[in-house]
Amino acid sequence: DFDPAIRTLTEEEAMDESRRCLQCDLVCNVCTTVCPNRANVALLSLPMPHPVQVAVRDGDGVRVETLSNGRLEQSYQIVNIADACNECGNCATFCPSAGAPYRDKPRIHLSRESFDNAPDGYRLASPSRLEGKRGGKAFSLAAEKDGFVFESDALIAHLDGGTLCATKVTLNGDVNEAALSGAVEAATLFRLLARKQPFAGPKHK
């Protein structure tokens, strides 16, 4: 018989170990400090609604179904400035979770050239317009007085400015059903970036 190679912790040891918890679910900005190019940026975030909805063609109209009503509660959100990131992977090495921030976090392009050369990412084209690409497919979000208008190859969605719930959706072509998660993500990101430097500079090229 042999003693266990790894023994269980005593109650006191377990309590001591729990004190080492970084509380990553509340705030974790490790990747912003270990990036040699300062490409990862932490943005202060107020609690925001995050509805999960899907648009379904219903006869001559479109029906919006709400699957859940979530909320974005973390005080800080991380974005990656693609222009400055050389994808060295340092942030992935130090990330206390299994993530790779330079790949997982929204990639923000400050220049038109950087945005045009990337298959994915976002660019604040003007103080009221966010452009994006996912898998090479373009979409845009325009901020209006009472909300947002999101346009992609699949749909045009009008979102309420307070709840981010869809108030009107038009499905394009032969599209019979489309998730609205991309629209909500774009609106959430716009709220984080708008009026914040270096994303909302006085000139947008």
Each predicted region: which residue ranges?
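Long C-terminal interaction/binding lobes of large macromolecular proteins
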Residues: G121-G136, A183-K205
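Polar low-complexity intrinsically disordered regions
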Residues: V30-T33, C95-S97, H204-K205
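Phenylalanine-focused residue identity feature
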Residues: F2, F94, F115, F139, ...
